[in-house]
A protein has these predicted regions:
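Glycine-rich, acidic/polar active-site loops that bind/position phosphate-bearing ligands
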Residues: 1-211
Length: 211
């Protein structure tokens, strides 16, 4: 039986190779130390029997090598400026927290149609071709009944997101054909962004099951 140890010191800070960041391998490995730092304000979760711990990734001299670090710094800067303004109005606060609830719109396309389009495969969007026979002029898709296979996809997506602690709230059709939307419950900014990334990952993982 394999036994793995994970200490609190390793949780607070790790030291992986950062030679590929931020520009794709311009630095020698021996000169490219990077550090992972635990983000204790974002929830850890279990995915595929693996404990996933949200972290920030910075260089030896403190430069951001990821997209989470600038977000955390932006939240802190916004809090500092909001506190400064509030003090002008006589309010004594220690921290101002921001919340967001990013809606995730998406298209569900049959696998055979997707694989026939190089633009979809390479860029995730259509770059050429004739306009759709039916566009966004009418409202019957937005207010229409959700198709059974789409509803089944949405149900499984909700269940998998709840297992990861992502609080999905509403789901509905969107305006364009094959377009749909998932709306989460508002949460602290960095937590909401982590949840949004998990949502997109689970969508891509579950969708192929439904053709």
């Amino acid at each position: 039986t394999a036994i793995m140890e994970f200490s609190g010191k390793e949780l607070v800070r790790g030291e992986p190779d950062a030679s590929s960041f931020p520009s794709g391998g311009l630095r020698a490995t021996c000169e490219a130390r990077g550090y992972t730092a635990w983000d204790p304000t974002s929830y850890a979760f279990v995915k595929d029997d693996v404990l996933c711990i949200p972290t920030a990734f910075v260089s030896y001299t403190g430069e951001a090598l990821d997209k989470k670090t600038p977000l955390l710094r932006s939240m802190n800067a916004l809090s500092n400026q909001a506190i400064r303004i509030l003090k002008l109005f006589g309010k004594d606060v220690d921290y101002v927290s921001t919340t967001v609830g990013p809606e995730q719109e998406y298209f569900l396309i049959k696998t055979e149609d997707y694989e026939a389009r190089q633009d979809l495969i390479l860029t995730g969007r259509t770059l050429f071709g004739a306009p759709s026979a039916k566009g966004q002029e009418l409202e019957e898709h937005y207010f229409g009944v959700i198709r059974p296979e789409v509803s089944a996809f949405m149900k499984e997506l909700d269940e998998e997101l709840w297992k990861l602690g992502v609080p999905a709230k509403t789901k509905h059709n969107e305006v364009a054909p094959c377009q749909h939307e998932l709306a989460p419950i508002f949460d602290t900014t960095n937590v909401a962004i982590d949840h949004n990334l998990l949502t997109m990952e689970m969508m891509k993982k579950i969708a192929p099951k439904y053709g």
